Design a protein with these regions (language model features):
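Non-globular, low-confidence helical/coil segments that flank catalytic cores
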Residues: 2-257
């Protein structure tokens, strides 16, 4: 996981405490995370170290949202973090940003271990083992997959969770990624999954507010994402890149950094 700060600073009246556990941890297997907490009981975002993948947990006013869960090998880590670190057994919302193994592979374990209220995905059918495994886990719990539309939103306590993308039909599965903006007071987080430039350009043309205090950088810091025009609209104070140490893809790419 990489952490980077850019020019604009957050509203520290909202961000009262920030814990950052950065750098890649060794093979001991501990979950490195960054927890952003506002107020004593209000809002926190946890970026779980799932290596070359994405996994985040958002908690607000006793409500819990999981955004991606890393690969299947990281499912137990996500569950352990939920149950042992956060003491959560009920997950109100799960978002699988897109049907790739490094994003949804660990979600079946979350669905099996926790009582999940709602599951979001950009598709409800997809011919690939990670998605089929997630769907079976959901079916076993009588949990329906909901395919949201851009512009729809839901409340997570006092936080608002809004879907901004996908806005079109794309050949590249990465561009199908559900892009989510979470706002709590004056603080905003933008989660982009693996959305690449075509999706980013559609978002910048949409007129929607893309600004964010914290950007979860798209596609693990690949140069296929985080275009200049997109970054100029988001203007984050901080950026989180989730990727594995010495990964085969060379993420994060130098030009993104």
């Amino acid at each position: 996981m990489k952490f980077k700060q850019h020019g604009k600073r957050p509203d520290w009246r909202a961000l009262l405490a920030v814990w950052l556990t950065l750098a890649f941890l060794t093979a001991a297997g501990f979950a490195a995370y960054s927890a952003w907490q506002t107020s004593r009981i209000g809002f926190a975002v946890h970026f779980v170290d799932v290596g070359q993948g994405d996994g985040a947990i958002v908690v607000c006013d006793g409500k819990t949202l999981v955004i991606d869960g890393g690969t299947a090998e990281n499912g137990a880590k996500m569950v352990e973090y939920l149950q042992n670190t956060l003491h959560v057994s009920r997950v109100d919302f799960v978002i699988g940003t897109h049907p790739h193994a490094d994003h949804i592979g660990g979600l079946p374990d979350v669905i099996r271990a926790c009582k999940v209220k709602k599951l979001y995905s950009p598709v409800d059918e997809f011919e690939a083992k990670p998605f089929e495994t997630m769907k079976r886990a959901a079916d076993d719990k009588k949990l329906k997959i909901t395919v949201p539309q851009a512009g729809q939103s839901f409340s997570l306590g006092r936080a608002k969770v809004e879907f901004l993308a996908p806005l079109g039909i794309y050949d590249n599965v990465n561009d199908l990624s559900l892009v989510v903006r979470i706002t709590y007071g004056q603080t905003a987080f933008l989660f982009t999954g693996d959305a690449e430039r075509p999706s980013e350009y559609d978002m910048t043309d949409s007129g929607e507010d893309l600004s964010a205090t914290v950007l979860k950088v798209g596609h693990h810091g690949s140069n296929t994402s985080t275009s200049y025009v997109f970054l100029r609209q988001v203007m984050p104070a901080y950026a989180i890149i989730s990727c594995g140490k010495d990964n085969a893809y060379g993420h994060p790419h130098e030009e993104v950094l």
